[in-house]
C-alpha cells in the first residue's frame, strides 16, 4: 500500500481507487473460486451418483448371477441324487446277479453230483429245469442291466 501511495504521488484518492479495484479483483477471484468449488462439488456429486448407479447395476447383475448359480446347483444336486440312486440300484442288481450266479453254480454242481453218484434221472431233470429257469432269470437281469 505504501508503494502504491508513492507511485500515485501521494494522492490518497487515487490510491484508494486502486486499492478498491484490487479489492474487487480479489472478490471476483473469491467468487470464481467459489464457483469452481461449487462446480467441482456438482461434478463430484454427479460422479458419485453415477458410481452409485453403476454399483446398483453391478449388484443386480451379481444377484442374477447368484440366482442362476443356485438354480444350476439345485439342478446338479438333483442329477447327483439321481446318479446315486441309480448306482445303488445297480449295486443291488449286481448283488442279486452274484447270488443267482452262485445258486446256479451250486445247482449245476448238485445236478452233476446226483447224476454221477445217485444216478437219479428224475431228480437230475428237476434240478436241470431249475437251473434253466435261473439262467433265464439271470439273462433277463443282465439284459436290464
UniProtKB/Swiss-Prot annotation:
Keywords, alphabetical: Membrane, Transmembrane, Transmembrane helix
First-listed, main subcellular location of the protein, grouped into a coarse class: membrane
Annotated transmembrane regions: 97-117
Location of the protein in the cell: Membrane
One annotated Gene Ontology cellular component of this protein: membrane
Domain of life according to the entry: Archaea
Membrane topology according to the record: Single-pass membrane protein
Name the UniProt record assigns to this protein: Uncharacterized protein MJ1417.1
